[in-house]
Amino acid sequence: MGRSISVSFGLLVVFLSLSGTGADQDCLPGWSSHEGHCYKVFNLDKTWEDAEKFCTEQGNSGHLVSIDSKKETNFVAELVSPNIKETRRTDFVWIGLRAEDKRQHCSSEWSDGSSINYQNWIEAESKKCLGLEKQTRYRKWVNLNCGKPYRFTCEI
């Protein structure tokens, strides 16, 4: 009987150590985990370029958030909404998408270099940087002036 309990306890310890005990186990304090990545909302007003630079300085291949699915859209929206402090600049939050003019052909990719596999535009406009809009509960992408300062979310 004692040996059976010991073996069962040992298996439980191995299972818990392999499965982890919390959602944020691999993320730094203050960061949130989702499908192998860590996310953090920053209540700092920065231009798109400065926000991207700030995210790269966070380490571990950090960039402005890239959104690859509806599931990730919902995760980011639910992370942003309660964590943005209300100011006049909280109507938009930068994401890592910017249209770049390469040889007069407009191409877009995430700031981490990954391709766009999922799209959630409000409407196409000529402005080159994208963000999430509060009016859509931070679930739709909107074109914004890259030089305006907004809050942002980093992903590592």
Curated annotation (Swiss-Prot):
Domain C-type lectin span(s) in chain numbering: 34-155
- Organism classification: Eukaryota, Metazoa, Chordata, Craniata, Vertebrata
Database matches in Pfam families: Lectin_C
User: Which is one GO molecular function term here?
Assistant: toxin activity
**A cellular-component GO term for this protein:** extracellular region
What is the predominant subcellular site recorded for this chain? secreted
Q: List the disulfide bonds.
A: 27-38, 55-154, 129-146
Indicate yes or no for the key word Signal: yes
- Cite the record's note on assembly: Heterodimer; disulfide-linked.
> What extra comment accompanies this record?
Shows greater sequence similarity to the alpha than beta subunits compared to other heterodimer snaclecs.
UniProt-listed SUPFAM superfamilies: C-type lectin-like
Task: Tell me where the signal peptide lies.
Answer: 1-23
Q: What is this protein's function?
A: Interferes with one step of hemostasis (modulation of platelet aggregation, or coagulation cascade, for example).
The protein's organism comes out as Macrovipera lebetinus
Q: In which tissues is it expressed?
A: Expressed by the venom gland.
Compartment(s) of residence: Secreted
Matching InterPro entries, A to Z?
C-type_lectin-like, C-type_lectin-like/link_sf, C-type_lectin/snaclec_domain, C-type_lectin_CS, CTDL_fold
User: Sorted alphabetically, which keywords does the UniProt record give?
Assistant: Disulfide bond, Hemostasis impairing toxin, Secreted, Signal, Toxin
The name on file for this protein is Snaclec A6
Question: SMART domains of this UniProt entry?
Answer: CLECT
Family as reported in the entry's similarity comment: Belongs to the snaclec family.
The answer to keyword Nucleotide-binding applying to this record is no
